[in-house]
Amino acid sequence: MKLKPVLYLLMLLGCLGLKSAHAATLAHGISASWHSFSQKWNEPQTFDPYIPSIIWHNRWTYDADKIDKYNERPWGAGGGVSHFDKKGNWNGIYLMAFKDSFNKWELISGYGWEKTWRPLSDPDFHLGLGYTAGVTMRDNWSYIPIPVLLPLASIGYEYVSFQMTYIPGTYNNGNVYFAWLRWQL
Protein backbone atom coordinates (compact mmCIF):
# COMPACT_ATOMS: atom_id res chain seq x y z
CA MET A 1 0.00 0.00 0.00
CA LYS A 2 2.91 2.39 0.49
CA LEU A 3 3.76 1.96 -3.19
CA LYS A 4 0.73 4.00 -4.30
CA PRO A 5 1.82 7.31 -2.67
CA VAL A 6 5.33 6.85 -4.06
CA LEU A 7 3.91 6.29 -7.57
CA TYR A 8 1.70 9.38 -7.24
CA LEU A 9 4.68 11.42 -6.09
CA LEU A 10 6.80 10.19 -9.02
CA MET A 11 3.99 10.97 -11.49
CA LEU A 12 3.57 14.45 -10.00
CA LEU A 13 7.30 15.15 -10.20
CA GLY A 14 7.36 13.85 -13.78
CA CYS A 15 4.50 16.17 -14.74
CA LEU A 16 6.21 19.12 -13.07
CA GLY A 17 9.37 18.32 -15.00
CA LEU A 18 7.41 18.25 -18.26
CA LYS A 19 5.70 21.52 -17.39
CA SER A 20 9.08 23.06 -16.62
CA ALA A 21 10.54 21.85 -19.92
CA HIS A 22 7.47 23.11 -21.78
CA ALA A 23 7.70 26.49 -20.05
CA ALA A 24 11.38 26.77 -21.00
CA THR A 25 10.55 25.95 -24.63
CA LEU A 26 7.70 28.47 -24.63
CA ALA A 27 9.93 31.15 -23.08
CA HIS A 28 12.62 30.46 -25.70
CA GLY A 29 9.99 30.70 -28.48
CA ILE A 30 8.69 34.02 -27.17
CA SER A 31 12.23 35.36 -26.81
CA ALA A 32 13.14 34.29 -30.37
CA SER A 33 9.92 35.83 -31.74
CA TRP A 34 10.56 39.11 -29.94
CA HIS A 35 14.14 39.19 -31.29
CA SER A 36 12.82 38.55 -34.81
CA PHE A 37 10.19 41.30 -34.44
CA SER A 38 12.67 43.85 -33.08
CA GLN A 39 15.16 43.00 -35.84
CA LYS A 40 12.51 43.74 -38.50
CA TRP A 41 11.74 47.04 -36.83
CA ASN A 42 15.29 48.18 -36.10
CA GLU A 43 17.13 46.69 -39.10
CA PRO A 44 14.66 46.50 -42.02
CA GLN A 45 15.99 45.35 -45.38
CA THR A 46 13.23 47.17 -47.26
CA PHE A 47 10.54 49.80 -46.80
CA ASP A 48 7.32 48.66 -48.46
CA PRO A 49 4.34 50.66 -49.72
CA TYR A 50 1.04 48.69 -49.68
CA ILE A 51 -1.88 49.24 -52.07
CA PRO A 52 -5.14 47.46 -51.07
CA SER A 53 -6.59 45.96 -54.27
CA ILE A 54 -9.50 43.56 -53.79
CA ILE A 55 -12.23 42.75 -51.28
CA TRP A 56 -14.27 39.79 -52.52
CA HIS A 57 -17.28 38.41 -50.63
CA ASN A 58 -17.64 34.66 -51.15
CA ARG A 59 -20.70 34.30 -53.39
CA TRP A 60 -21.56 30.89 -51.86
CA THR A 61 -21.92 32.39 -48.38
CA TYR A 62 -23.79 35.66 -49.06
CA ASP A 63 -27.24 36.61 -50.27
CA ALA A 64 -27.14 38.55 -53.56
CA ASP A 65 -28.82 41.62 -52.04
CA LYS A 66 -26.03 41.85 -49.42
CA ILE A 67 -23.27 41.55 -52.03
CA ASP A 68 -24.90 44.29 -54.12
CA LYS A 69 -24.57 46.69 -51.15
CA TYR A 70 -20.92 45.92 -50.37
CA ASN A 71 -17.82 47.76 -51.53
CA GLU A 72 -15.31 45.43 -53.20
CA ARG A 73 -12.79 48.10 -54.24
CA PRO A 74 -10.83 48.96 -51.08
CA TRP A 75 -9.00 52.09 -52.08
CA GLY A 76 -6.44 53.12 -49.51
CA ALA A 77 -2.74 52.77 -48.76
CA GLY A 78 -0.29 51.47 -46.24
CA GLY A 79 3.32 50.87 -45.50
CA GLY A 80 5.68 48.57 -43.71
CA VAL A 81 9.17 47.29 -43.24
CA SER A 82 10.33 43.81 -44.16
CA HIS A 83 13.20 41.44 -43.87
CA PHE A 84 14.17 38.10 -45.40
CA ASP A 85 15.69 35.73 -42.85
CA LYS A 86 18.60 33.31 -43.37
CA LYS A 87 16.23 30.71 -44.83
CA GLY A 88 14.83 33.20 -47.36
CA ASN A 89 11.46 33.54 -45.59
CA TRP A 90 9.69 36.91 -45.57
CA ASN A 91 8.89 38.77 -42.32
CA GLY A 92 7.19 42.14 -42.16
CA ILE A 93 5.54 44.74 -39.95
CA TYR A 94 2.79 46.77 -41.62
CA LEU A 95 -0.04 49.29 -41.28
CA MET A 96 -2.85 49.75 -43.84
CA ALA A 97 -5.89 52.02 -44.03
CA PHE A 98 -8.57 51.24 -46.61
CA LYS A 99 -12.30 51.45 -47.35
CA ASP A 100 -13.98 48.28 -46.02
CA SER A 101 -17.08 46.43 -47.24
CA PHE A 102 -19.32 49.21 -45.92
CA ASN A 103 -17.15 51.88 -47.60
CA LYS A 104 -15.93 53.03 -44.17
CA TRP A 105 -12.31 53.36 -43.12
CA GLU A 106 -10.66 50.27 -41.66
CA LEU A 107 -7.19 50.11 -40.15
CA ILE A 108 -5.10 46.98 -39.81
CA SER A 109 -1.63 46.70 -38.36
CA GLY A 110 0.43 43.65 -37.60
CA TYR A 111 3.24 41.24 -38.22
CA GLY A 112 3.36 38.88 -41.19
CA TRP A 113 5.49 35.82 -41.91
CA GLU A 114 5.68 33.73 -45.08
CA LYS A 115 7.64 30.63 -45.96
CA THR A 116 9.01 31.55 -49.39
CA TRP A 117 9.49 29.15 -52.33
CA ARG A 118 11.19 29.79 -55.64
CA PRO A 119 9.77 26.93 -57.76
CA LEU A 120 11.05 28.06 -61.17
CA SER A 121 14.53 28.35 -62.60
CA ASP A 122 13.99 32.13 -62.52
CA PRO A 123 14.96 33.08 -58.93
CA ASP A 124 12.94 36.32 -59.13
CA PHE A 125 9.59 34.45 -59.17
CA HIS A 126 8.41 33.48 -55.69
CA LEU A 127 5.45 32.06 -53.79
CA GLY A 128 4.71 32.49 -50.10
CA LEU A 129 2.49 30.88 -47.49
CA GLY A 130 2.23 31.90 -43.85
CA TYR A 131 0.22 33.96 -41.39
CA THR A 132 -0.43 37.46 -40.16
CA ALA A 133 -1.17 38.47 -36.57
CA GLY A 134 -2.25 41.93 -35.55
CA VAL A 135 -5.20 44.18 -34.79
CA THR A 136 -7.90 45.72 -36.94
CA MET A 137 -10.30 48.57 -36.23
CA ARG A 138 -13.60 49.09 -38.08
CA ASP A 139 -16.48 51.55 -38.00
CA ASN A 140 -19.09 48.84 -37.34
CA TRP A 141 -17.12 47.79 -34.21
CA SER A 142 -16.76 51.41 -32.98
CA TYR A 143 -13.04 51.29 -33.88
CA ILE A 144 -12.30 49.02 -30.92
CA PRO A 145 -9.01 47.16 -31.64
CA ILE A 146 -9.87 43.55 -32.51
CA PRO A 147 -7.07 40.95 -32.63
CA VAL A 148 -6.68 38.98 -35.87
CA LEU A 149 -4.79 35.83 -36.78
CA LEU A 150 -5.21 35.04 -40.47
CA PRO A 151 -3.61 32.94 -43.21
CA LEU A 152 -1.33 34.78 -45.63
CA ALA A 153 -0.30 33.84 -49.17
CA SER A 154 1.55 35.62 -51.96
CA ILE A 155 2.80 35.42 -55.50
CA GLY A 156 5.54 37.75 -56.58
CA TYR A 157 8.24 38.71 -59.03
CA GLU A 158 11.38 40.56 -58.02
CA TYR A 159 10.32 43.36 -55.66
CA VAL A 160 6.54 43.24 -56.20
CA SER A 161 4.23 40.82 -54.37
CA PHE A 162 0.50 40.27 -54.55
CA GLN A 163 -0.38 39.25 -50.98
CA MET A 164 -3.73 37.92 -49.86
CA THR A 165 -5.71 36.54 -46.95
CA TYR A 166 -9.13 34.99 -46.32
CA ILE A 167 -11.26 36.12 -43.40
CA PRO A 168 -13.44 33.16 -42.33
CA GLY A 169 -16.99 33.67 -41.11
CA THR A 170 -20.61 32.57 -41.10
CA TYR A 171 -23.44 33.04 -43.59
CA ASN A 172 -23.65 36.73 -44.64
CA ASN A 173 -20.72 37.59 -42.35
CA GLY A 174 -16.99 37.23 -42.92
CA ASN A 175 -15.91 34.81 -45.68
CA VAL A 176 -14.01 37.61 -47.39
CA TYR A 177 -10.94 37.42 -49.63
CA PHE A 178 -8.72 40.49 -49.21
CA ALA A 179 -5.64 41.22 -51.33
CA TRP A 180 -3.09 44.00 -51.80
CA LEU A 181 0.09 44.84 -53.71
CA ARG A 182 3.35 45.27 -51.82
CA TRP A 183 6.50 46.82 -53.29
CA GLN A 184 9.87 46.37 -51.63
CA LEU A 185 11.91 49.59 -51.97
Swiss-Prot record:
GO biological process, one term: lipid A biosynthetic process
PROSITE patterns: PROKAR_LIPOPROTEIN
Pfam family of the protein (one): PagP
E.C. designation(s): 2.3.1.251
Membrane topology per record: Lipid-anchor
Entry similarity comment: Belongs to the lipid A palmitoyltransferase family.
HAMAP family: PagP_transferase (MF_00837)
Protein name: Lipid A acyltransferase PagP
Organism name: Erwinia sp. (strain Ejp617)
Originating gene: pagP
